[in-house]
């Protein structure tokens, strides 16, 4: 209840009749002239009214009236709801009268009547007495219309809610139990259960009036809708009773249950349905009744459980499910990986990772992948080499092994210090799907040309005047050039030509462009060489000390030609080695000079060679002075041959090398380059000392390596 206490101005009463008070929530009522004595021979009735939905509460703050037996002379009479609430007079503590004291007077309705009556005089034992009268406060108090009917007998005070009554300050409203609908009169209820919706995670549902008889002619639809990912469980309680027939199944009344739109049962009779795990978050219960019957109906409790997904199962023995759980439910997930050396495959697509999530319908959002062994693919081809499988031929999957090797004896695998060639060339297909070597990683090895090891080396133990025709494979490094006439050179590695600078830039001639450089390799016959085609030149490098304009100075007479493409080495095409010490220039050491130059004043068609000793430097200097020549003979040159040998390099042999066999390694070394001389077979020949230019040669070759 809500009580409102406030004061308002005093109300003065007049003799005779009734005085209505304007409808307010609170106020006061006084006797005339209060607190002065009230007049004689006075009667009036004050009507106190509060808004509908409230009751009137009245309390006297001050009360001083003439006392009398039975309050016959002066009195205040209070009535409400057609009932007399009392007749009062006197004062608190007087021997006569009936003062109200602090008693609270309460109406059942929104009206209260207060009648004030005085007689013709106020005397006591011949003495005139003065009485102040009364002061009373009233207030509106909320009326609980939903409480039981008062004893006043006023039927309009009792709400006629058929089902449920709800009180509020100043009024009330009616509502109906689930399955019923409030009618237009706002008091009565009629069955209406065609669209009952339940969304809580658990609860109870029953037929109307359960466990009393349900109403006739029902068409009820109870829908349970919970969050996706939950599954509903139904458990029917006792008693279960729906009209039935002994011979026909549920002809009168029936309860139908649907889950996911599918009918999972139709029930009647007295046998309680079994418990249902619907595997659905949506269930509908349809209850139909005919016009008769007195069965008690049904009631169920529904609960929810998070939906579960089936236990994930791998498709092969190589798939691994991380942290496998005993069960998986909605929103759980699992991660699948592969054992070492295998990779995830979904359809035809390679996956880097795999995660599957349990969906709200109890299925995984993607199918289990399979694990396929890693395939490293076909091993890369090794230039100037090949590979062989040390495991199953043609199988390139995880743990497969191959051995790279070079085409010997023409190439040899580059190895690190302290490592073996077999270790350098052994590659394994790793778990990452990459061919890998323990030392070199993914990088494949290199096959380096083997220098100075001809398959068919020259054998010459005697001097032959005018030289000798070379056989195939005697001088496989020999190069035939045709620039400013015939010239020679030697193969270094598989794409460099060592030659004399003056074959490219002859003394007192103009420079020649790369386009006119003709280079041939791989045969001892000129005509056959021409058939093998020219090797294009990518770059020409002339030593900076070479001076084309100084005709008697062949200082720095050395050059390098870089081929556009590497050549493939073989028995007739092999490089020569570079010197690494001065012993290759010891006096009398025999060397070989080969070329396609002039022989007996005729152009040679075949490769020929001569065998010459390294000459004494002083003898060569003396011989030059005897010829009255001003030619420069520097420390970067050496001489070979002897005036008595009648053998020498000649025109067309320039650029070829002076080749010496190293007895310690059995390798052939290019110690010199045919540079200059005086005539052919008429004395000493002069050669560029290659040892003094090895650093320059290596630097030039490394720039493009």
Curated annotation (Swiss-Prot):
For the EGF-like domain, which residue ranges apply? 142-190
Compartments where located: Secreted; Cell surface
Glycosylation sites (chain numbering): 125, 221, 514, 581
In this chain the CUB domain maps to: 18-141, 193-305
- What Gene3D superfamilies does this protein map onto? Complement Module, domain 1 (2.10.70.10), Laminin (2.10.25.10), Spermadhesin, CUB domain (2.60.120.290), Trypsin-like serine proteases (2.40.10.10)
Which cysteine pairs are covalently linked by disulfides here? Answer: 71-89, 146-165, 161-174, 176-189, 193-220, 250-268, 309-358, 338-371, 376-429, 406-447, 451-577, 620-639, 650-680
Which sequence positions carry the modification called Phosphoserine? Answer: 206
Annotated signal sequence range: 1-17
Q: Which SUPFAM superfamilies match?
A: Complement control module/SCR domain (SSF57535), EGF/Laminin (SSF57196), Spermadhesin, CUB domain (SSF49854), Trypsin-like serine proteases (SSF50494)
Per the UniProt record, the site (Cleavage) maps to 463-464
Catalysed reactions, semicolon-separated: Selective cleavage of Lys(or Arg)-|-Ile bond in complement subcomponent C1s to form the active form of C1s (EC 3.4.21.42)
Q: Which residues bind Ca(2+) 3?
A: 243, 253, 290, 294
Q: What is this protein called?
A: Complement C1r subcomponent
Q: Which organism is it from?
A: Macaca fascicularis (Crab-eating macaque)
Name of the encoding gene = C1R
């Amino acid at each position: 209840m809500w009580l409102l206490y406030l004061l308002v101005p005093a109300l003065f009463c007049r003799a005779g009749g009734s005085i209505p008070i304007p409808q307010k929530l609170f106020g006061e009522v006084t006797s005339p002239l209060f607190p002065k004595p009230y007049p004689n021979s006075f009667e009036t009735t004050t009507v106190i009214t509060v808004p509908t939905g409230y009751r009137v509460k009245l309390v006297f703050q001050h009360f001083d009236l003439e006392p009398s037996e039975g309050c016959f002379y002066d009195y205040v009479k209070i009535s409400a709801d057609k009932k007399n609430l009392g007749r009062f007079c006197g004062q608190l503590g007087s021997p006569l009268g009936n003062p109200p004291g602090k008693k609270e007077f309460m109406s059942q309705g929104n009206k209260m009547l207060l009648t004030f009556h005085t007689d013709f005089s106020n005397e006591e034992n011949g003495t005139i007495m003065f009485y102040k009268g009364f002061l009373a406060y009233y207030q509106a108090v909320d009326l609980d219309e939903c409480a039981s009917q008062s004893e006043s007998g006023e039927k309009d005070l009792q709400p006629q809610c058929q089902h449920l009554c709800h009180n509020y300050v100043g009024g009330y409203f009616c509502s109906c139990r689930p399955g019923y609908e409030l009618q237009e009169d706002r008091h009565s209820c009629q069955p209406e259960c065609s669209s009952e919706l339940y969304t809580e995670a658990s609860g109870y549902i029953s037929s109307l009036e359960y466990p009393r008889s349900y109403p006739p002619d029902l068409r009820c639809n109870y829908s349970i809708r919970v969050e996706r990912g939950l599954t509903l469980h139904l458990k029917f309680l006792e008693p279960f009773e729906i009209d039935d027939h002994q011979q026909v199944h549920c002809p009168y009344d029936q309860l139908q249950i649907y889950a996911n739109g599918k009918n999972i049962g139709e029930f009647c009779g007295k046998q309680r349905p079994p418990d249902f795990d619907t595997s659905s978050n949506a269930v509908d219960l349809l209850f139909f009744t005919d016009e008769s019957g007195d069965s008690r109906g049904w009631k169920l409790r529904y609960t929810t459980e998070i939906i579960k997904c089936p236990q994930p199962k791998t498709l092969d023995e190589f798939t691994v499910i991380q942290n496998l759980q005993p069960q998986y439910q909605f929103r759980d997930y699992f991660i699948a990986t592969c054992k070492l050396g295998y990779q995830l495959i979904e359809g035809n697509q390679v996956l880097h990772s795999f995660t599957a999530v349990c969906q709200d319908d109890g299925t995984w959002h993607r199918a289990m992948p399979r694990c396929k062994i890693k395939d490293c693919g076909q091993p890369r081809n090794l230039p100037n080499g090949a590979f062989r499988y040390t495991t199953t031929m043609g199988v390139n999957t995880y743990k497969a092994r191959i051995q790279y090797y070079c085409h010997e004896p023409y190439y040899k695998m580059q190895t690190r210090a302290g490592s073996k060639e077999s270790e350098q060339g052994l590659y394994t297909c790793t778990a990452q799907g990459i061919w890998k070597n323990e030392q070199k990683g993914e990088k494949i090895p290199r096959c380096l040309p083997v220098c100075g090891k001809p398959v068919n080396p020259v054998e010459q133990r005697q001097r032959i005047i005018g030289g000798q025709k070379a056989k195939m494979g005697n001088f496989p490094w020999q190069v035939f050039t045709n620039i400013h006439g015939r010239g020679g050179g030697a193969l270094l590695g598989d794409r460099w030509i060592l030659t004399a600078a003056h074959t490219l830039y002859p003394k007192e001639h103009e420079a020649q462009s790369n386009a006119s450089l003709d280079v041939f390799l791989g045969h001892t016959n000129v005509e056959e060489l021409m058939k093998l085609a020219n090797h294009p030149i990518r770059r020409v490098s002339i030593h900076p000390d070479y001076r084309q304009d100084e005709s008697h100075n062949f200082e720095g007479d050395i050059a390098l030609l870089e081929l556009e493409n590497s050549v493939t080495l073989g028995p007739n095409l092999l490089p020569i080695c570079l010197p690494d010490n001065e012993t290759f220039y010891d006096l009398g050491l025999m060397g070989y000079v080969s070329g396609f130059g002039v022989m007996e004043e005729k152009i040679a068609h075949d490769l020929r060679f001569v065998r010459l000793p390294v000459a004494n430097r002083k003898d060569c200097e003396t011989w030059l002075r005897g010829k009255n020549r001003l030619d420069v003979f520097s420390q970067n040159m050496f001489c070979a041959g002897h005036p008595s040998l009648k053998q020498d390099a000649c025109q067309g042999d320039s650029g070829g090398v002076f080749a010496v066999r190293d007895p310690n390694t059995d390798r052939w070394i290019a110690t010199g380059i045919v540079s200059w001389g005086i005539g052919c077979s008429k004395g000493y020949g002069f050669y560029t000392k290659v040892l003094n230019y090895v650093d320059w040669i290596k630097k030039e070759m490394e720039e493009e390596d």
